[in-house]
Amino acid sequence: MDLQSLKQSVSQRLEFIGGALERFRTRDAEREELLAQQLSTMQEKVAAMEAHSEQMQAQVRRERERAMTDLLTQLPNREAWQERLAFEYNRWQRYRHPLSVSVIDIDLFKKINDSFGHKAGDRVLQLVAREMKSRLRSTDFIARFGGEEFVLLLPETGLEAARDVVEQFREHVGKLPFHFGGKPVSITFSAGVSEFRDGDTEDAVFDRADRALYQAKDAGRNQVMVD
């Protein structure tokens, strides 16, 4: 083979190899592009799933909050109270820090309903709830227990200090300016307070506070008693 023929043969071979390399690079680039598209699609799906999960979790939290809230007063309801009481009771059993409970009942509430109607009664409940909630300490927990009755949980608070807190609530509620149908309506409450003691169950301390409440009622209402 002469030199010219050899050059031509080598040139053809190089062209063939170059073409093969170009086709390989093209296919490789196409594969990379396809993989990038698939990865992008997967990332979008994961992001959509995460967003949906967050929405569902937020909805569950909202539904739970609604289930734990009294619609009229916007305070925690009895179910929320039972959950929080169980938590604080377990904490008290472990650390033995002071823990007190108060049961609060609006005085002569039936008379308010009978005299002014249920709208007035509802408004009284809302006013009392708002007033007490605004004066809660950061660790306290208040709930509407039912009807005109509220319950207050006071962690890190002994009996006398708890009575002082509830007494301040009583004084402020008694000063609430409330008129219905152009007539002034007096709002007061009676309350019982008790502190957890050795051997107490959740029901035991609640029963003592409830008993103290009725002692306050029997003694003339608009006062706080302890047991």
Give the location of each predicted region:
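Signal-transducing coiled-coil linker helices
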Residues: 8-72, 78-91, 95-98, 140-143, ...
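Conserved nucleotide-binding and Mg2+-coordinating catalytic segments in signaling enzymes
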Residues: 65-83, 104-118, 126
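Heptad-repeat coiled-coil signal-transmission/dimerization helices
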Residues: 81, 85-86, 102, 124-125, ...
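Nucleotide second-messenger and two-component phosphorelay signaling modules
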Residues: 87-100, 104, 115, 134-141, ...
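Hydrophobic framework residues that shape the active-site pocket
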Residues: 109, 128, 142-145, 150, ...
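Alpha-helical scaffold within the catalytic cores of cyclic-nucleotide enzymes
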Residues: 129, 161-177
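Catalytic core regions of nucleotide second-messenger enzymes
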Residues: 144, 173-189
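Catalytic-core segments of nucleotide cyclases and related cyclic-nucleotide turnover enzymes
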Residues: 163, 181, 194-226
